[in-house]
C-alpha cells in the first residue's frame, strides 16, 4: 500500500509540473502521522455498508492518538515492515537485493486499488500531501472523538453502524458526489 501512496504522490507532482523526484525521496517525506492517516482513510474508503471485503478486516487495531487514528500493530512494528526499514524518522525502501517478494491476495489488492482510486478522485477536497489537513480531517470524524475521550482509546471499527456513520461523515467532508 505504501508503494501505491508513493505512485499517487508522483502523479500529483507530475500534474503540478514539479521537478521529478525519486520514489525514495518521496518516501522520505512520508511521516508516520501521514502514513497512519492515509492508511485509515484508505481503509475507510474501502468500507461498504454491507458484508463484503474491506481493509478493516486486515488493519483492525486502530486507536485514537492525539493526531488521529493509528493502526497500533503497524505503528508498533514499523521497524519490521517488509521491503522497508525504519531509520528512526522515516521508512527507507530496501534495495531489490534485500527486498522480500510477497504475493498479495487478489481481494486485498482490488480493495486497496478501489479505495485509493476513490480518494484520488476527490483530489480537490482530499489533500493527501498535507499532514495537517489529514489530521484535522480525522478529528472531524465521530469515531476518533468517541475513542479519544474514552478510557480505552480503541476505535470501534467492528460496529457496522458506527463505521457506516463514519463513512457517511467522511464522504460529506470530502464532497462525494462533486
Ranges and model annotations:
Residues 1-178:
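Domain-edge interaction signal
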Amino acid at each position: 500500500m505504501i508503494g501505491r501512496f508513493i505512485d499517487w504522490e508522483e502523479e500529483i507532482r507530475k500534474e503540478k509540473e514539479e521537478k521529478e523526484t525519486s520514489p525514495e525521496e518521496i518516501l522520505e517525506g512520508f511521516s508516520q502521522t501521514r502514513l497512519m492517516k492515509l492508511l485509515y482513510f484508505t481503509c475507510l474508503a474501502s468500507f461498504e455498508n454491507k458484508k463484503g471485503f474491506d481493509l478493516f478486516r486486515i488493519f483492525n487495531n486502530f486507536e485514537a492518538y492525539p493526531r488521529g487514528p493509528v493502526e497500533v500493530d503497524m505503528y508498533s512494528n514499523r521497524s519490521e515492515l517488509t521491503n522497508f526499514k525504519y531509520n528512526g524518522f522515516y521508512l527507507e525502501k530496501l534495495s531489490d537485493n534485500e527486498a522480500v517478494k510477497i504475493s498479495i491476495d487478489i481481494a486485498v489488492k482490488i480493495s486497496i486499488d478501489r479505495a485509493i482510486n476513490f480518494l484520488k478522485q476527490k483530489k480537490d477536497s482530499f489533500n493527501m500531501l498535507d499532514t495537517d489537513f489529514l489530521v484535522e480531517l480525522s478529528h472531524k470524524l465521530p469515531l476518533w472523538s468517541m475513542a479519544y475521550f474514552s478510557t480505552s482509546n480503541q476505535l470501534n471499527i467492528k460496529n457496522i453502524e458506527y463505521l457506516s456513520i463514519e463513512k457517511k461523515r467522511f464522504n460529506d467532508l470530502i464532497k462525494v458526489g462533486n
